[in-house]
Amino acid sequence: MLCLGASASASALISRSAPAANEKFGLYAYGENLGGLSLFYADGLAYIGDPANSTSSTASSVSFKRESDSSSSWIANPNGTTKAEAGWSDELLYIPSSSSSDHQMGFTSSERSNETTSGFIFYGQWVMVELESGDISSSFYVREESEGKGVYSLLWNVTDEETAIPISLRSVEPSNA
């Protein structure tokens, strides 16, 4: 009986809600052999892993914020460096639009026709995308890159690639962080 009581009170301490409006948050990938690697920026694209292992000179950890609880566009800024050092700020996270042949996710300061910067939602701490059709999807994948050891491209809606690994994106840091 004591064990159950301890478990119940310990689980009550863990927040299960989405980050609040204007609260900074990071995103972490969980999947096969991926126990909470962080999302980072490099050359305008989204990657998973340690930015220190990236070969890009613009690699930077990212913090996001939503301007309101109903906002489905997420604003990214460098986390841990000054905006001047990073060379970018206030970029929107995007998924490739359904008309795009590319699956790589990234960051943009102004949405182009082959990019979708809205529709990002939380289900608790799990990231989902509400599509134009009204369907909700979490079709996130990663593929190991030559960009650096332990660095993965963050992909959207990959259905025809054997090297892509399905993942979940969450706002929860791994317990070993």
Regions found by a protein language model. Give the residues of each.
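Extracellular glycan/ECM-engagement signal in secreted proteins
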Residues: L13-Y47, S99-A177
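Cleavable N-terminal signal peptides of Sec/SRP-targeted secreted and luminal proteins
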Residues: M1-A12
